[in-house]
Amino acid sequence: MSNLRIVCQHCPSVVFNNKRPDVVKRPTMSAMLHSETQEDLETDDFFLLKDPFAFDNVSVSKPLANNYKLLACADCEKGPLGYYDSKNNEYLLLCSLEKN
């Protein structure tokens, strides 16, 4: 399995440089933040991580009203790069951050 390297879009910090995680479909950040229910939500591709220590440089926000937390670059504090789902203990990093 190859490595995945994600660099912050706003500064030169490496956010993730580790084994390529599994890709899963989860609700988009917009849908997750604005929906009352979890039914029929628009989805997006995310890299799934269970261990916060797999990241090189990420910060996690305080819980939002729906108990999700946003992921951001720990150096420049810009994001969101994805979100943390505390109910399922999933750190979800946007696949769109990968540069081809």
UniProtKB/Swiss-Prot annotation:
<dbReference type="GO" id="GO:0016020">
    <property type="term" value="C:membrane"/>
</dbReference>
<feature type="binding site">
    <location>
        <position position="73"/>
    </location>
    <ligand>
        <name>Zn(2+)</name>
    </ligand>
</feature>
<feature type="binding site">
    <location>
        <position position="11"/>
    </location>
    <ligand>
        <name>Zn(2+)</name>
    </ligand>
</feature>
<keyword id="KW-0862">Zinc</keyword>
<dbReference type="InterPro" id="IPR011057">
    <property type="entry name" value="Mss4-like_sf"/>
</dbReference>
<feature type="binding site">
    <location>
        <position position="8"/>
    </location>
    <ligand>
        <name>Zn(2+)</name>
    </ligand>
</feature>
<feature type="binding site">
    <location>
        <position position="76"/>
    </location>
    <ligand>
        <name>Zn(2+)</name>
    </ligand>
</feature>
<dbReference type="GO" id="GO:0005829">
    <property type="term" value="C:cytosol"/>
</dbReference>
<keyword id="KW-0653">Protein transport</keyword>
<dbReference type="GO" id="GO:0008270">
    <property type="term" value="F:zinc ion binding"/>
</dbReference>
<dbReference type="InterPro" id="IPR011323">
    <property type="entry name" value="Mss4/transl-control_tumour"/>
</dbReference>
<comment type="function">
    <text>Guanine-nucleotide-releasing protein that acts on members of the sec4/ypt1/rab subfamily.</text>
</comment>
<keyword id="KW-0479">Metal-binding</keyword>
<dbReference type="InterPro" id="IPR007515">
    <property type="entry name" value="Mss4"/>
</dbReference>
<dbReference type="Pfam" id="PF04421">
    <property type="entry name" value="Mss4"/>
</dbReference>
<protein>
    <recommendedName>
        <fullName>Guanine nucleotide exchange factor MSS4 homolog</fullName>
    </recommendedName>
</protein>
<dbReference type="GO" id="GO:0015031">
    <property type="term" value="P:protein transport"/>
</dbReference>
<dbReference type="GO" id="GO:0005085">
    <property type="term" value="F:guanyl-nucleotide exchange factor activity"/>
</dbReference>
<keyword id="KW-0344">Guanine-nucleotide releasing factor</keyword>
<comment type="similarity">
    <text>Belongs to the DSS4/MSS4 family.</text>
</comment>
<dbReference type="GO" id="GO:0007264">
    <property type="term" value="P:small GTPase-mediated signal transduction"/>
</dbReference>
<dbReference type="GO" id="GO:0006892">
    <property type="term" value="P:post-Golgi vesicle-mediated transport"/>
</dbReference>
<feature type="domain" description="MSS4">
    <location>
        <begin position="1"/>
        <end position="100"/>
    </location>
</feature>
<keyword id="KW-0813">Transport</keyword>
